[in-house]
């Protein structure tokens, strides 16, 4: 897979993640129940900030870019995957599908961002 394809996957990830949090926010406001235990406003804000940094990463020097990517990978792995795996409780999730979707979307993000970063390391 070339870096253009990987770049498209990363854009798809952020679109999915932000959309998931927006749907969760709408559900909270209409049904008083979120998709996951993550606060949807916090989730949307964090994902939007990371997406903005991703969009600007082409103009960044290598070291700051790597620091941001490593921080992103760490935070999404711990808060977006492991937290959901460890803390599953039916009252914190709309359904098992929403629980699984949060884990799947964030796993896709870690994989796509990680692969894109590796592909950009000069040989």
Give the predicted meaning of each segment.
Residues 68-77, 99-107:
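Hydrophobic alpha-helical segments of small multi-pass membrane proteins
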Residues 22-32, 80-89, 118-122:
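Juxtamembrane "helix-exit" motif on the non-cytosolic side of transmembrane helices
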Residues 34, 61-68:
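Short, aromatic-rich membrane-interface segments at the entry and exit
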């Amino acid at each position: 897979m070339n870096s253009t394809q990987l770049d498209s996957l990363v854009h798809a990830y952020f679109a999915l993640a932000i959309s998931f949090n927006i749907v969760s926010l709408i559900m909270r406001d209409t049904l008083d129940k979120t998709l996951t235990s993550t606060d949807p406003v916090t989730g949307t804000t964090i994902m939007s900030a990371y997406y903005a940094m991703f969009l600007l990463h082409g103009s960044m020097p290598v070291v700051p870019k790597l620091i941001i990517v490593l921080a992103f990978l760490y935070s999404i792995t711990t808060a977006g995957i492991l937290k959901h795996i460890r803390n599953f409780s039916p009252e914190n999730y709309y359904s098992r599908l929403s629980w699984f979707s949060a884990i799947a979307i964030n796993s896709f993000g870690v994989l796509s961002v990680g692969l894109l970063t590796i592909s950009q390391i000069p040989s």
